[in-house]
């Protein structure tokens, strides 16, 4: 094991406001958050060969070295280029290669072609990162740059999770079953019991970003919602429960499925969660025996909805989930804060094991308006056809565990650490 990868590298809490503020751990400075976040990305990459870091298993995923370079492009484009006098781009060709989806920043390579980039090599992408890190130093203490730096840190932390889930999917394609990590962490299972009950009424959800250290624009504005009485399970659906769903013909019963979901199951030949094979599943440490008490993960919205129907329950709305989590401590769950393997565990915590599907479409809150300029493309333009997930996963950075956080994916996607928690009316 690379000794550099064994160091404890804690990414900065770019958001510790709201309910997350209950944690007694002091928030690091913005400059410390920047440096530790950038170091963690490199520590993850040190476990990969150049070939590992270049492959792309599907259009939804990206090569590891692309993540490393894209996050550097973000700082170069939105901070160094516009705020550091005399700054020259590291390479004039890189914006075309490493822009993701920002139309205002010009043309870019097609997403499905990212895995064709044999050049620049991994070491060149790392050299790009180090040059950007050095150039950023004069900006780290500037108050006028602080909001964009915080956004860049949060953006990179999101890509750290994507790097892990993308490389997991890529290694899964290899018949040799290669592992990124030597072993999985010890994750004792402490499953919650019973239900969190709420009597309904008027509640407030969302976040006013001006009132906290950082949040994404899609988390606000804070607004009122009307809730009917409901209960939310204290436990995530487990592998054992999912195996019962399979044994009972859950993947063969069209009455349980949404029409689009049933078409997807038949078109793709879906018979189990992604990475399942017999009693084993593929992990970042290769093939392992599946823990029946661990949460069922790598499931799509379609699968989550079908399971809820089979169980005689339903998925929660994002408002229900957020209100139920109002008194939870986001620091209580698992956190991805070092370059070590991650694996979901059953915990009584709402946060930090797997992202949990809700039945809520990812749509703008009342009064939402995206930021001006290219950074306004970060969230708002994706508010179509996707569903909200709550709770953070074992691969999510520490500072992203908060009730107002809105993750989102298309209903067929399942390569992330996604699971479910049941709800019902009362």
Across the structure, where does each feature detected by a protein language model lie?
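A general secondary-structure boundary signal
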Residues: 133, 137, 195, 202-204, ...
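Functional-site microenvironments in short loops/helix caps that host divalent-cation chemistry
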Residues: 152, 156-158, 162, 166, ...
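Disulfide-stabilized, aromatic/cysteine-rich ligand-recognition loop
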Residues: 2-62, 66-135, 146-150, 154-171, ...
């Amino acid at each position: 094991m690379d000794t550099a990868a064994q160091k404890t590298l804690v990414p900065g809490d770019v958001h510790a406001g709201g309910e997350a503020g209950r944690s007694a751990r002091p928030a690091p400075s913005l400059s410390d958050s920047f440096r530790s976040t950038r170091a963690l990305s490199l520590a993850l990459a040190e476990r990969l060969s150049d070939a590992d870091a270049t492959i792309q298993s599907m259009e939804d995923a990206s090569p590891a070295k692309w993540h490393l370079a894209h996050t550097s492009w973000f700082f170069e484009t939105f901070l160094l280029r516009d705020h550091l006098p005399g700054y020259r781009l590291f390479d004039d060709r890189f914006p075309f290669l490493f822009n993701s989806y920002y139309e205002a920043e010009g043309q870019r390579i097609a997403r499905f072609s990212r895995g064709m980039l044999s050049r620049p090599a991994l070491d060149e992408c790392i050299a790009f990162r180090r040059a950007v890190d050095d150039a950023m130093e004069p900006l780290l203490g500037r108050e006028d740059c602080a909001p964009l730096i915080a956004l860049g840190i949060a953006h990179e932390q999101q890509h750290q999770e994507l790097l892990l889930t993308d490389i997991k999917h890529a290694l899964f394609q290899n018949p040799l079953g290669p592992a990124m990590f030597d072993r999985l962490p010890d994750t004792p299972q402490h499953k919650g019991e019973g239900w969190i009950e709420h009597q309904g009424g008027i509640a407030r959800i969302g976040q006013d970003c001006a009132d906290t250290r950082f949040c994404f624009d899609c988390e606000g504005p804070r607004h009122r919602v009307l809730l009917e009485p409901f209960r939310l399970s204290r436990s995530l659906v487990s592998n054992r429960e999912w195996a019962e769903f399979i044994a009972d013909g859950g993947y063969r019963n069209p009455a349980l499925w949404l029409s689009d979901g049933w078409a997807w199951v038949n078109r793709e030949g879906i018979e189990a969660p992604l990475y399942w094979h017999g009693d084993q599943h593929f992990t970042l440490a290769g093939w392992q025996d599946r823990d029946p008490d661990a949460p069922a993960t790598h499931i799509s919205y379609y699968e989550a909805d079908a399971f809820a129907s089979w169980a005689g329950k339903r998925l929660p709305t994002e408002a229900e989930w957020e209100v139920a989590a109002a008194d939870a401590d986001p620091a209580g769950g698992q956190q991805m804060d070092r370059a070590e393997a991650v694996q979901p565990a059953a915990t009584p915590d709402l946060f930090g094991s797997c992202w949990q599907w809700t039945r809520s479409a990812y749509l703008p809150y009342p009064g939402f308006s995206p930021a001006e300029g290219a950074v306004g493309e970060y969230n708002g333009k994706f508010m179509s056809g996707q569903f909200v997930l709550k709770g953070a996963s074992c691969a999510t950075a520490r500072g992203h565990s908060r009730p107002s956080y809105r993750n989102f994916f298309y209903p067929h996607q399942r390569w992330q650490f996604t699971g479910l928690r049941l709800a019902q009316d009362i």
